[in-house]
Amino acid sequence: MARKKISIIGAGNVGATAAHWAASKELGDIVLLDIMEGIPQGKGLDLMEASPVEGFDCHIIGTNSYADTANSDVVVITAGIARKPGMSRDDLITTNTKIVADCAKKAAEQSPDSIIIIVSNPLDAMTYVAQKASGFPTNRVFGMSGILDAARFKTFIAMEMGCSVKDVSTILLGGHGDDMVPLPSYTFIGGIPIRQLLPEEKIQAMVDRARKGGAEIVAYLKTGSAYYAPSASVIQMVEAILKDQKRILPVAAYLNGEYGYEGIYTSVPVMLGANGVEKVFEIELTAEERQLFAKSVDSVKNLIAVTGM
């Protein structure tokens, strides 16, 4: 059986680290593409040379040509400018709209049956741009957001509790930004509702920290943004697709009437498998949660309007 093929567009920190995670899991052969000559080639070769040490079998190449991405099963788009301190994800929209549209169009031409996953920011709007530019069905274009946001929330909970992160489960909704909606009502520690274990003020402090999780990393790094957790998050999605795992994960998916919204991308729980987003799950929300979700959706709508697509 032929190996699966994963193309990663953008060989910066997120793209290269995603390639590393994918290789270590032996998910398939990997193409790392970037417009900067030499960068993807060098990183691809460096990663390939790690394979005898770590014992993973896959072929990795770096390239500047979309022709090398032909017949990919999954295309991950990380290309675009990154945030600097004081910038929001939304500040990137004008530049990254052009970049993501170009990447999605070229990738779709080479791999018309592929699934496209967006990591570029502002994520929900860029996922919308990629779907329009590629012309793909909406179930085959979606974004990495909720997995990362939930991972941050779970990390802070485990740190507060002093427990294993493996025992923390949660879900969240909304855009990948300051208006995201972590859901303590769907958060459990070893199967126990979080509100039975922690006071409300501590829970809300962690909710706020999760919303600002990306900005916290940017403030520390000063010259870039997070890449270990974002790349691990997108490769969890790639694995679910290539192995047809039917995982229930929060991703930036297209809403077609679910939750009362139409024609936008935002993070909701979905079933992720070989066909991409195979089902969108509508969960019950309190009045306050619905209000917060509506605010988040409005923010996404405003960004989509700016793209002009």
UniProtKB/Swiss-Prot annotation:
<protein>
    <recommendedName>
        <fullName>Malate dehydrogenase</fullName>
        <ecNumber>1.1.1.37</ecNumber>
    </recommendedName>
</protein>
<dbReference type="InterPro" id="IPR015955">
    <property type="entry name" value="Lactate_DH/Glyco_Ohase_4_C"/>
</dbReference>
<dbReference type="GO" id="GO:0006089">
    <property type="term" value="P:lactate metabolic process"/>
</dbReference>
<dbReference type="Pfam" id="PF02866">
    <property type="entry name" value="Ldh_1_C"/>
</dbReference>
<dbReference type="InterPro" id="IPR001236">
    <property type="entry name" value="Lactate/malate_DH_N"/>
</dbReference>
<dbReference type="GO" id="GO:0030060">
    <property type="term" value="F:L-malate dehydrogenase (NAD+) activity"/>
</dbReference>
<feature type="binding site">
    <location>
        <position position="121"/>
    </location>
    <ligand>
        <name>substrate</name>
    </ligand>
</feature>
<dbReference type="GO" id="GO:0004459">
    <property type="term" value="F:L-lactate dehydrogenase activity"/>
</dbReference>
<comment type="similarity">
    <text>Belongs to the LDH/MDH superfamily. MDH type 3 family.</text>
</comment>
<keyword id="KW-0560">Oxidoreductase</keyword>
<feature type="binding site">
    <location>
        <position position="83"/>
    </location>
    <ligand>
        <name>substrate</name>
    </ligand>
</feature>
<dbReference type="Pfam" id="PF00056">
    <property type="entry name" value="Ldh_1_N"/>
</dbReference>
<comment type="function">
    <text>Catalyzes the reversible oxidation of malate to oxaloacetate.</text>
</comment>
<feature type="binding site">
    <location>
        <begin position="119"/>
        <end position="121"/>
    </location>
    <ligand>
        <name>NAD(+)</name>
    </ligand>
</feature>
<dbReference type="GO" id="GO:0006099">
    <property type="term" value="P:tricarboxylic acid cycle"/>
</dbReference>
<dbReference type="InterPro" id="IPR011275">
    <property type="entry name" value="Malate_DH_type3"/>
</dbReference>
<keyword id="KW-0816">Tricarboxylic acid cycle</keyword>
<dbReference type="InterPro" id="IPR036291">
    <property type="entry name" value="NAD(P)-bd_dom_sf"/>
</dbReference>
<feature type="binding site">
    <location>
        <position position="34"/>
    </location>
    <ligand>
        <name>NAD(+)</name>
    </ligand>
</feature>
<keyword id="KW-0520">NAD</keyword>
<feature type="binding site">
    <location>
        <position position="89"/>
    </location>
    <ligand>
        <name>substrate</name>
    </ligand>
</feature>
<dbReference type="InterPro" id="IPR022383">
    <property type="entry name" value="Lactate/malate_DH_C"/>
</dbReference>
<dbReference type="InterPro" id="IPR001557">
    <property type="entry name" value="L-lactate/malate_DH"/>
</dbReference>
<feature type="binding site">
    <location>
        <begin position="10"/>
        <end position="15"/>
    </location>
    <ligand>
        <name>NAD(+)</name>
    </ligand>
</feature>
<feature type="active site" description="Proton acceptor">
    <location>
        <position position="176"/>
    </location>
</feature>
<feature type="binding site">
    <location>
        <position position="96"/>
    </location>
    <ligand>
        <name>NAD(+)</name>
    </ligand>
</feature>
<feature type="binding site">
    <location>
        <position position="152"/>
    </location>
    <ligand>
        <name>substrate</name>
    </ligand>
</feature>
